[in-house]
Amino acid sequence: VAEGSSMYLKVGEKVRLSDLASGMMMASGNDAANAAAYTISGSPEKFSQRMNEKAKQIGMTNTNFVTPSGLDDDNHYSSAKDMALLMSYALENDDFANLTAKKSVTVEFLEPKSKKTAYANHNRLLSLYPYCTGGKTGYTTAAGRCLVSSAKKDGVTLVCVTLNDRNDWNDHISLYDYAFEKYRGVDCKDADFCADIPCVGGDKDSVT
């Protein structure tokens, strides 16, 4: 991998596919992403095709994946809205939700069996903000600092996305504090009250 971070896999070493997920989510391992792509689809190109199919399925309309790791390519792009949709979808998977909430993971290698490596989560928001439940950092020279995160308070889960933001930790905290303060539920008990509420990314365009 020409640029970026790694979980530092070596030729001949063996780990579980779930360990590659840990390497990606904790250490931002580009090598882990590429290894997973080869294992699942046979090549990064074919895996990226599957990524695009899933993106379309969940309503990501301004995204095109070219590299499994997220490293720069002229045709590799997304938007804050699409990343929020992806994070919301991913959090529905219990394995992902549990993994992204961890501050560190220790990987026990299959080969060599004696090797164990601890990987710390790059997402500092887990330590800086008590309501943070997970997220993913990202950085390249072209994209700058990018952060997708989630937080839960009083039964309400929110997702926040910033792109090319040098002050991402503080900005996410400020945005969450504002959103949680302003959010309120409405108990509709009046049988005469009825309205169509528009939805984004759902099975229907609106609910009544």
Name each region found by the language model.
Residues 60-61, 72-77, 81-208:
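Domain-terminus/edge residues, biased toward the C-terminal soluble/receptor-binding domains
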